[in-house]
Amino acid sequence: MEPQDAAAPRSGLSLPSLRAAAGVFGASAAATAVCGIPAGFLWGALAPRVLVRVVSKGTAEIVQPETSAFIAADLWFCLIGVAGGLLTGVLGYLLAVRRRGPTAAAGLIAGALGAAAVTLWLGENYGLAGFRHQLAHSPPGTQLHASLALGATGGLVFWPLAAAFVIAVSELAVRSRGWSHALARSRADSPRR
């Protein structure tokens, strides 16, 4: 085995290409995560809230522990996450992944997880100050609608999974279309018997 020359160029990624990849990843992630803002307000506006009764200043109990409002709030979060994932997956694929490849796809999926976290934070804090104020100043026996809380934290993965699904299906569709065109060309070029 011959010794390698120290001055010989190394194969692999250069610093400028790493910076470019980091920029693509960061831009894809940030652009996708920002989509969690309207989703959070949408979840806060659409999801039903649990009815609670003030027990004393600052404390409350759930009026109906068997209420379906918990499940409905989680369902709304998951539906908004799937819709957000499908939308950002399609737009992200068309605007970034086709041109920038796997780095943009990874950024988009990381950003989708960020968007789900932003949606959760905004939705849970939507109306929280008003609820706390009412809870602190209402007499015992008053019924209030509580702020949202996601019970099924697994709902956070719906957005990134939907985005990853769209990217994978889009890439497979593009590649299979390319393969079918190549196959048709090879059949057209082959001599007929």
Where are these regions (language model features)?
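Alpha-helical transmembrane segments of integral membrane proteins
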Residues: 19, 23-31, 72, 76-80, ...
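Hydrophobic alpha-helical membrane-insertion segments
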Residues: 28-44, 106-124
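Short, Lys/Arg-rich, polar N-terminal cytosolic tail immediately upstream
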Residues: 1-18
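Hydrophobic alpha-helical transmembrane segments
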Residues: 69-84, 142-165
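Juxtamembrane non-transmembrane "cap" segments at the membrane-aqueous interface
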Residues: 51-54, 116-139
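Cytoplasmic membrane-interface segments at the C-terminal ends of transmembrane helices
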Residues: 13-24, 48, 87-105, 124-131, ...
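Interfacial/capping segments of alpha-helical transmembrane domains
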Residues: 38-57
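Perimembrane loop-to-helix junctions flanking transmembrane segments
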Residues: 51-70, 138-140
